[in-house]
Design a protein with these regions (language model features):
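Short boundary/loop segments of OB/S1/cold-shock single-stranded nucleic-acid-binding domains
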Residues: 96-116
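Aromatic/basic micro-patches that form nucleic-acid/chromatin recognition or nuclease catalytic surfaces
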Residues: 3-82, 151, 155
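Short aromatic-glycine-enriched beta-strand elements
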Residues: 130-134
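GIY-YIG nuclease signature motif recognition
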Residues: 1-3, 122
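Domain-scale terminal segments
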Residues: 37, 91-93, 127
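Structured surface patches comprising rigid loops and adjacent beta-strands/short helices at the edges
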Residues: 139-155
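Divalent-metal-activated hydrolytic enzyme cores
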Residues: 77-102
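Structural detector for short beta-strands of small beta-barrel domains
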Residues: 118-126
Length: 155
C-alpha cells in the first residue's frame, strides 16, 4: 500500500491494527516482499469473521520481528539485489490502532445482494471496513458504488 494511503487502506479492509514494515521504490519490489511474507501469514481478509467482531490486539512489532526472522534469508537476498534505496526496513514505526463504530456485531453474517433483492431494510448497527452492519444483514457498500441508492430514517 502506498504510504499516502495509510491508514485508509487498513480502514477499508476492516483492520483494527496496522504497522508499516517496508518502504519500497516500486510496486514490483512490494510484490516480491509480499510473496516472501505470505508463505508465513495469510494475506486475505476473511470478511465474514471480520464482521463478527474484533480480533484480540497483537503486539505487531513483535509479530513483525518474528516474521522478518522467518524470511531473513529471502529478504536479505532482495535487499542485496535492489539495495537500501529499493527496499528499506521500517523498524521504528508505531502501531496504528483503528476503532470502528459498531454497537453490535452479527452472530451470523448474512450478506445483502441488491441485484437479487433490491430492497433491504434494517437498523444500522455499525460500520466496519467497507461494510454497513444492519440488524438484518451486512452489505459491502463499495460493491454498489455506481448504484442509485435511497436511504430513509424513521424516528
Amino acid at each position: 500500500t502506498r504510504g499516502d494511503q495509510l491508514p485508509t487502506r487498513w480502514i477499508d479492509q476492516g483492520a483494527t491494527q496496522g504497522l508499516p514494515i517496508f518502504r519500497v521504490t516500486n510496486r514490483r519490489h512490494a510484490g516480491l516482499i509480499e510473496d516472501r511474507l505470505r508463505q508465513h501469514v495469510a494475506d486475505k481478509t476473511q470478511w465474514q469473521r471480520m464482521l463478527k467482531g474484533n480480533n484480540d490486539d497483537l503486539n505487531l512489532p513483535s509479530v513483525r520481528d518474528d516474521l522478518l526472522e522467518k524470511c531473513r534469508l529471502d529478504l536479505q537476498e532482495l535487499s542485496d539485489q535492489y539495495g537500501l534505496q529499493g527496499i528499506q526496513l521500517l523498524d521504528q514505526e508505531l502501531t496504528t490502532e483503528i476503532a470502528f463504530p459498531v454497537e453490535q456485531f452479527p452472530k451470523k453474517v448474512k450478506s445483502f445482494n441488491l441485484d437479487k433483492q433490491p430492497l433491504m431494510e434494517g437498523v444500522l448497527q455499525g460500520i466496519k471496513g467497507q461494510y454497513l452492519i444492519l440488524d438484518t444483514g451486512v452489505i459491502n457498500i463499495r460493491k454498489y458504488t455506481a448504484y442509485n441508492v435511497e436511504f430513509s430514517v424513521e424516528a
